[in-house]
Amino acid sequence: MIISSTLDYRKAAKRRLPPFLFHYIDGGAYAEETMRRNYADLQALALRQRILRGVGEVDLSTKLFDQTLDLPIILAPVGLTGMYARRGEVQAARAAVAKGIPFTLSSVSVCPIAEVQKAVGSAFWFQLYVLKDRGFMRDVLERSWASGVRTLVFTVDMPVPGARYRDAHSGMSGSYAGLRRILQAFIHPHWAWNVGIMGRPHDLGNVSTYLQKKIALDDYIGWLGANFDPSIGWHDLQWIRDFWKGKMILKGILDPEDAREAIQFGADGIVVSNHGGRQLDGVLSTVRALPAIAEAVKSDLTILVDSGVRSGLDVVRMIAQGADAVMIGRAFVYALAAAGEKGVAHLIDLFANEMRVAMTLTGVRAIKEITRESLASPDVFEQ
């Protein structure tokens, strides 16, 4: 199969993965309207082509906090990444580090912090949910800091899990889910051998380390669901800001008022995110929400964005709308499932090449030159 885009990697991943895993990463909440709008609204944002601008060389690097990135891209935290390829978090982290961008390890990863640190050193970020079990939160913060992690992505848009109807149909949850997953593995022998057998253990590495017992896939939804805390408020989180001495990014901001409160909280950055359309269906796409948030807090916070990004053109669009850098989640998992570490590295190269072409044809030489002037229709969502 010829692979030349994220969409090609998605097709390859669908063929290789058991349905319960493919639809877990591919699906959204409820009717998936927000998930579809994330992508569609980005495509509706036209770039402004300029000619004869003398763009001899394009610089894709950018400064983010105290890091210089080769690209304004970060691999987003994705739970259970290690179920998509053998020790998937390690493979994705290696690809990211080789390409000069950060990898963000999910707190509900298969590979624990120590395993990723052994593979790539301290060159990764760590993500954490707000959970009732404060002991677990403190434990993983201490272990990530001891491993050299200095950037924490704190997910704040998941006080309760979204209703993901696809999961019940695919076998991730619902009646006879365990049996259905076993049957699916039998008809996907490559995955069954390479990941199902050779990729063990399949527990939640960070949780198992804390509890000193294995938390397998069957227990994943129950453990996580029992630990979400919808009663949480800003004041309840102050201990985390006081405890964590590195950079802290709040992930899940969709409203300018919440972005302003993030400043008061002491955040160093935010991720404008609707969780890839996997939480509350019917909310704004991130590319629509981004300009108002950027206008409100751009001078005070580093702004990242995710959801719907499938190409380097989309990265340029998001930066033009006010982002400093972009996180990609589904896209890299498709590539990981299809071709492992090499697939993720190739995908990052595809994004880089697409960005170079887009920047050349819009007449900009560096990331800092991408502005609303790079768009032909910056006000398309206001019409």
From Swiss-Prot:
Binding positions (FMN): 106, 127, 155, 251, 306-330
Molecular function terms, GO-annotated: FMN binding; L-lactate dehydrogenase activity
PROSITE patterns in alphabetical order: FMN_HYDROXY_ACID_DH_1 (PS00557), FMN_HYDROXY_ACID_DH_2 (PS51349)
Coiled coil, from the record: none
Active site (UniProt): H275
Cofactor: FMN
Location of this chain's protein in the cell: Cell inner membrane
The reaction(s) this protein catalyses: (S)-lactate + A = pyruvate + AH2
Top-level EC class as recorded in UniProt: oxidoreductase
Domain FMN hydroxy acid dehydrogenase: 1-380
SUPFAM superfamilies given in the database record: FMN-linked oxidoreductases (SSF51395)
Main localization category: membrane
Domain of life: Bacteria
Function in brief: Catalyzes the conversion of L-lactate to pyruvate. Is coupled to the respiratory chain.
Family membership noted in the UniProt record: Belongs to the FMN-dependent alpha-hydroxy acid dehydrogenase family.
Name the record gives this protein: L-lactate dehydrogenase
Organism annotation: Bartonella henselae (strain ATCC 49882 / DSM 28221 / CCUG 30454 / Houston 1)
Gene responsible for this protein: lldD
